[in-house]
């Protein structure tokens, strides 16, 4: 189920694409994804075009995220990679600092695009393996982390993100 509010055509479709990814992931992946990966992928679905009765997603045209990334970098507010892959959205939202929120989301978007696209797709096979293994529940996790990854009724805690995010990034 999904509740949608009309916040203007572009923003409404952006929110539907983003939240639609979360619903898809929640339904079809055995393991939930670490926050940087889940949010990074969700932002790939925020920009779409409609032509001949079909919607097409175009991650490269997500100008709001690209603008936020540019602003983050220009202001020197970027997160270190180790911090980014170990952070959860709740942590940055709790700071009540717009720059921290912008940094987390825009850098997660950029990191996922980098893994998919950089160097003519050099890392895309490992990126796909990371997703495939998450979908099948085959990540090399200890029993507690595996239980949290699999049981959507358990909260994805800050500690889980701190352990699992970096572990998966290094593994894949």
Label the model's feature ranges.
Residues 29-172:
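Acidic/His/Gly-enriched intrinsically disordered linker/tail segments
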């Amino acid at each position: 189920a999904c509740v949608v509010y009309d916040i203007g055509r572009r923003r409404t479709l952006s929110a539907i694409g983003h939240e639609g990814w979360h619903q898809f992931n929640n339904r079809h992946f055995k393991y939930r994804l670490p926050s940087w990966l889940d949010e990074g992928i969700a932002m790939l679905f925020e920009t779409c075009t409609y032509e001949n009765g079909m919607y097409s997603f175009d991650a490269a045209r997500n100008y709001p995220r690209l603008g936020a990334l540019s602003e983050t970098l220009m202001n020197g507010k970027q997160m270190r990679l180790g911090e980014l892959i170990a952070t959860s959205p709740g942590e940055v939202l709790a700071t009540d600092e717009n720059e921290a929120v912008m940094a987390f989301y825009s850098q997660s978007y950029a990191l996922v695009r980098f893994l998919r696209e950089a160097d003519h797709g050099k890392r895309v096979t490992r990126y796909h393996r990371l997703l495939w293994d998450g979908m099948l529940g085959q990540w090399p996790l200890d029993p507690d982390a595996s239980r949290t990854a699999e049981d959507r009724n358990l909260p994805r805690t800050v500690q889980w993100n701190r352990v699992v995010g970096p572990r998966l990034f290094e593994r894949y």
